[in-house]
């Protein structure tokens, strides 16, 4: 891992969204920008591990479907990924983690064929006490949400494909007109419906429960309402002389020191040549000032 300077654009996520309305841009482009920022409302839910006081926190935009969570998936880079492996699964888990490390995030998200490995461990659904098998899969990224998701295959296409491939139970919890589908051949992803197979939530409208569930979960003490963003801080990697100057001075005594605000913007001096020298030195290395 390399230390990198980053532009903390996530701190401006809400302003970036709000100010899209001030731009004289095509609506299509503004929608693309909004989708890129990706603001979502949901909940973080704590699942305790079976026979343990440890817990895994997942982020979900659909806490109303918690009764339908039949498995959990962690990113292979998740801090607990290796420790969840049992003696029987450890070799497969470590091999899968290594395989995922060799893929880019783009490759992982675009992969049509879902891959994964069962850790051998279980979490406990905090609503109904059901055992939830914990899997690793590279379609979950460590830097989005908590790096762990609860999976509701009856109502998510990706989860449905994963559950079908690995023979994981599928429990429908939202139904059109309250009628359960006898043989599901695809996920029911309609935005509205009536809650079924959901204990005390049965009969509620899913659109209403979606808004109320984060606060119910918070009151019960195993989660909290949360806002999340797809937007990530911007890494300034492979920065060169012709790039944006980063206003940080490297002091031999004090370390990295920010340039005072009254001295901004930082302008680089003119140089005779800014092309690579072949020695790895910066074009600024020859400047005596």
Kindly give the residue locations of the regions a language model identified.
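Residue patterns forming the tRNA-binding/recognition surfaces of aminoacyl-tRNA synthetases
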Residues: 1-56, 63, 148-286
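Nucleotide/phosphate-binding sheet-loop regions of phosphoryl- and nucleotidyl-transfer enzymes
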Residues: 3-10, 67-96, 174, 190, ...
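Short hydrophobic-aromatic micro-motifs
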Residues: 7, 58-59, 66-74, 132-136, ...
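Short glycine-rich loop/turn motifs
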Residues: 40-44, 70, 118-120
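A short local loop/turn or secondary-structure capping micro-motif enriched for an aromatic residue
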Residues: 65-67, 141-143, 267-269
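Catalytic alpha/beta core of large soluble enzyme barrels
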Residues: 78-177, 182-183, 187-188
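Short, charge-rich amphipathic segments
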Residues: 85-97, 271, 275, 283-287
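Short acidic, Pro/Gly- and aromatic-enriched capping/linker segments at domain boundaries
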Residues: 112-120, 278-289
């Amino acid at each position: 891992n390399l230390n990198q300077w980053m532009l903390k654009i996530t701190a401006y996520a809400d302003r970036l969204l709000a100010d899209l309305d001030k731009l004289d841009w095509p609506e299509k482009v503004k929608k693309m920008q909004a989708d890129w920022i990706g603001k979502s409302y949901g909940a973080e839910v704590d699942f305790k591990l079976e026979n343990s006081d440890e817990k895994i926190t997942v982020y979900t935009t659909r806490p109303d479907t918690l009764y339908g969570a039949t498995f959990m998936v962690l990113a292979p880079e998740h801090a607990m990924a290796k420790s969840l492996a049992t003696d029987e699964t450890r070799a497969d888990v470590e091999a899968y983690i290594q395989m995922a490390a060799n893929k880019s995030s783009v490759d992982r998200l675009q992969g049509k064929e879902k891959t994964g490995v069962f850790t051998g461990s279980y979490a406990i659904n905090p609503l109904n006490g059901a055992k939830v098998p914990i899997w690793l899969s590279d379609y979950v990224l460590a830097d989005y949400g908590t790096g762990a998701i609860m999976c509701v295959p009856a109502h998510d296409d990706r989860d449905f494909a994963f559950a079908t491939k690995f023979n994981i139970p599928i429990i429908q919890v939202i139904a059109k007109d309250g009628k359960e589908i006898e043989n599901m051949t695809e996920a029911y992803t309609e935005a509205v419906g009536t809650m079924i197979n959901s204990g005390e939530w049965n009969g509620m409208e899913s659109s209403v429960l979606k808004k109320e569930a984060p606060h119910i979960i918070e009151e019960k003490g195993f989660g909290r309402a949360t806002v999340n963003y797809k937007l990530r801080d911007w890494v300034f990697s492979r920065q060169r002389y012709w790039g944006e100057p980063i206003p940080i001075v490297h002091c031999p005594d004090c370390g990295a020191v920010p340039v005072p605000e009254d001295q901004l913007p930082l302008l680089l001096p003119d140089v005779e040549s800014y092309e690579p020298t072949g020695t790895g030195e910066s074009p600024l290395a020859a400047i005596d000032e």
